[in-house]
Amino acid sequence: PDRLRIDEVASDGATDLALFDGKQITVLSADENVYAQAPQPPSIEDALVYFVRDLRMRAPLSLLLSTHVRTELPALAKEVDYVESTQIRGQTAHHIAGRGDSVDFQIWIAEGTSPLPLRIVITYKLEQGQPRFAAEISDWNISPKFSGNTFQLALPKDARKIPFAVQLLAP
């Protein structure tokens, strides 16, 4: 696929949208009524790498979408430990923790025939204050059906286009 939609709600209630429509990447901050756009590389995997590496945007769960997760994860995590078997929303899950040079992570993976992530916590060790990203993931649908407008951008009235921050730094 060449399309992806990420709807984010921050802990303060602010909402953001990252839309990869196959031609361009759009990030919209609805609360601030601003958006930024950049051309999208052809595949979602390449687009996510570009989004994180070149546009310097955060996409904490992007590694889960990578076909190279098995080779990339060992480079990020210098140490991985099995913590325990526990319950997440009534479902048995395996709690795994990893430590790396720049990030620490914890992931809870469902036990059984559908070993999908149920909870993820990522700590950015090199950033000021060591911020954490936490996600509770439920209602997995691995065979979704999308409506025609899922990947169409509907900008709010009077939304203002701004550059990505990294574009301001370019010579």
Q: What do these predicted ranges mean?
A:
Residues 1-59, 129-133:
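An acidic-aromatic
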Residues 42-79, 83:
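Solvent-exposed helix/loop surface patches that form functional interfaces
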Residues 11, 26-27, 75-164, 168:
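Gly/Pro-enriched, hydrophobic low-complexity segments
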